Each structure stands twice: as structure tokens, then as C-alpha cells.
A protein has these predicted regions:
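Absolute protein N-terminus
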Residues: 1-2
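C-terminal structural segments of small proteins and small subunits
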Residues: 34-35, 42-71
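Compact, glycine-rich, soluble single-domain proteins
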Residues: 6, 19-44, 48-49
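Active-site-proximal or metal-binding-adjacent scaffold patches in catalytic folds
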Residues: 12-15
């Protein structure tokens, strides 16, 4: 399953919002340096979908706010 994600780094709270078009907006308190925000997003997605972190793979958007993950 592929998931389109819009990442909001340096947010006040960690949360996941489902948009009407099916994409996810993931708010993370982590700064977008050295892939730390992406790692935090993977952790949050793993908790949200109740899967191990190792089963989530970044397909596109390593340095972008718009990312595509595969579970």
C-alpha cells in the first residue's frame, strides 16, 4: 500500500491528520535535519498502522515535505 504524506516539521504537537483526498498530514516536533523528521514520521506511521518500522519504506521525497511511503 502506498501512502502520500505531507510532513509539517517543527510543529507544536506530533499528530496525523487524514485529508479528504486520502493523503496524510503528519505534524512532527522534530526539525528536518539529517533525516530526523523523516525517521520520526516513519515511527508515527508505524504506530498509526500498527506495523513494525522496518515494514515502512520511503519511496519518494527524501528531502521534500511531500513524501510517498510504502507499507
Amino acid at each position: 500500500m502506498r501512502i502520500n504524506v505531507r510532513v509539517i516539521p517543527r510543529a507544536k504537537l506530533n499528530k496525523i491528520e487524514v485529508q479528504p483526498d486520502g493523503t496524510l498530514r503528519v505534524h512532527t516536533t522534530t526539525a528536518p535535519t539529517d533525516g530526523k523528521a523523516t525517521a520520526d514520521v516513519i515511527r508515527m506511521l508505524a504506530e498509526h498502522y500498527n506495523v513494525p518500522k522496518t515494514s515502512i519504506r520511503l519511496i519518494r521525497g527524501e528531502t521534500s515535505r511531500d513524501k510517498v511511503f510504502e507499507i
